[in-house]
Amino acid sequence: GRSKINKLVDGSLKWKILQQTSDFSMPISLAFFSSVGYSHRSLNSIYGDVVRNFKSNEAHRFNYFTQLIIASKVTSWLSMELLPSYMHRNYIMESVNSNNKAMDVNGFFSMGIGGRIKFTKRVSFIGDYFYNFAKFYQNNDKVKNPLALGFELETGGHVFSLFFTNASGLIENNFITQTADSWTKGQIKFGFCISRTFAL
């Protein structure tokens, strides 16, 4: 995929490890997800105003995201996900949280939680939230944890996801690290996705 934010091009893979069974002999589904992002911004944009006492390095354009997707259809109307995740960015500009003096870090863990509540056969309420464990993201006035809430509409051939969120990016490499807006300040965006399953 490609995102305008940071001019990020990304590729990903997903591997299903376990499949939940209807009799709950296997109560969860488990999948491994990983993505690599490459920013094709100019090097001046990547390095910003930093005084460089090092050589420019093409590797600084890359970032990586890895996640386990632990999901369960708890009942006919409730599904839940836990998303332990790890983010690594090869290069970051120096930044300090003014509230706790913690420095931003290249790599850190986060935990996502997601859920779906089915109202009818075709209409569901959906939501997800990510909490970043690095001290830099705790009580930070400039960076917030991303939260999205919305509805999912199934029309037979397509699935429409309509949601409100404080995140700007659509892919993990952007929204986990760079969500600057706050729900409490009314800084909310509306977005939608359309999914279509093809069988060959």
Predicted regions, residues:
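Outer-membrane pore/translocation modules
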Residues: G1-N106, F175-K185
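Hydrophobic, lipid-facing positions within transmembrane beta-strands of outer-membrane proteins
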Residues: V9-G11, Y64-L68, F109-I113, N145-L149, ...
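Residue-level detector of the transmembrane beta-barrel scaffold of outer-membrane proteins
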Residues: S12, S29-F33, S79-E81, S124-I126, ...
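Residue-level signature of outer-membrane beta-barrel architecture
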Residues: W15-I17, S72, I117, Y131, ...
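Structural signature of outer-membrane beta-barrel domains
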Residues: L18, G37-S39, M87-Y91, D128, ...
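Repeated loop/turn-to-beta-strand initiation elements of outer-membrane beta-barrel proteins
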Residues: Q20-D23, R41, W77-M80, K121-G127, ...
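Surface-exposed extracellular loop regions of Gram-negative outer-membrane beta-barrel proteins
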Residues: M111, R116-I126, Y131
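Outer-membrane beta-barrel "beta-signal"
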Residues: L149-H158, L162-G169, K185-L200
